[in-house]
Curated annotation (Swiss-Prot):
Name of the featured protein: Homeobox protein BarH-like 1
Keyword Chaperone among UniProt keywords: no
Entry's Gene Ontology cellular component terms: nucleus
Naturally occurring in which organism (per UniProt): Mus musculus (Mouse)
GO molecular function: DNA binding; DNA-binding transcription factor activity, RNA polymerase II-specific
Length: 254
């Protein structure tokens, strides 16, 4: 039998060059101690241990628990703000770039496609999409342009207004076609002209307005066509004319 001290005796210990795999005894049940590797054999390079510790800090619970310097957080915030202000201030839905950024790619789902955008841009895109999809949203009506009448049109309207303060539908159609205007233009002009006419009547000493509160004419306030023709005939007869006795006197003198 060979004794352990004799040369050539079998060795029952771990071979040389192999690490000692003895069980590591934990001093506590903390997560940090469980995740950290047991101390290496004596003589191991401290640089390798530091590198392994750095790798552990990048991933896992240790990275969350590790204290980071304050200036790194400021740098990250500044970088995110700079990325936000690089985008144009115009609404994203109105530009091709914004719609391309907010829409998902052909091989990429919607949420994953927009996850690379800053939070401000994502929220702005959602608000615009919600605002444009409202069913009750109405577009603002543009203000109508003021109609500019020609001199001939104004003369025709004034002449007709002197005779007829209110137009029926057939009369309005005939007047609009004769002057080259639309029915709405003739109707609007008549309404404005009647308002002016009422003011003139009241300022001229009239005690009452020639029309009712709703705008309809009162009885006997507007002359009929027969009355107008009689008034014209009376004006013609009132013109100075030669007396029948004058030519006979001249003949006598001759």
């Amino acid at each position: 039998m060979q004794r352990p001290g004799e040369p050539g005796a079998a060795r029952f210990g771990p071979p040389e060059g192999c690490a000692d795999h003895r069980p590591h005894r934990y001093r506590s049940f903390m997560i940090e101690e469980i995740l950290t590797e047991p101390p290496g054999p004596k003589g191991a390079a401290p640089a390798a241990a530091a590198a392994a510790a750095g790798e552990l800090l990048k991933f896992g619970v240790q990275a969350l628990l590790a204290a980071r310097p304050f200036h790194s957080h400021l740098a990250v915030l500044k970088a995110e703000q700079a990325a936000v202000f690089k985008f144009p201030l115009a609404p994203l839905g109105c530009s091709g770039l914004g719609s391309a950024l907010l829409a998902a790619g052909p091989g990429m789902p919607g949420p994953a496609g927009a996850s690379h955008l800053p939070l401000e841009l994502q929220l702005r895109g959602k608000l615009e999409a919600a605002g444009s999809g409202e069913p009750g949203a109405k577009a603002k009506k543009g203000r109508r342009s003021r109609t500019v009448f020609t001199e001939l049109q104004l003369m025709g309207l004034e002449k007709r207004f002197e005779k007829q303060k209110y137009l029926s539908t057939p009369d309005r159609i005939d007047l609009a076609e004769s002057l080259g205007l639309s029915q709405l233009q003739v109707k609007t002009w008549y309404q404005n002209r009647r308002m002016k006419w009422k003011k003139i009547v009241l300022q001229g000493g009239g005690l009452e307005s020639p029309t009712k509160p709703k705008g309809r004419p009162k009885k006997n306030s507007i002359p009929t066509s027969e009355q107008l023709t009689e008034q014209e005939r009376a004006k013609e007869t009132e013109k100075p004319a030669e007396t029948p006795g004058e030519p006979s006197d001249r003949n006598c003198e001759d």
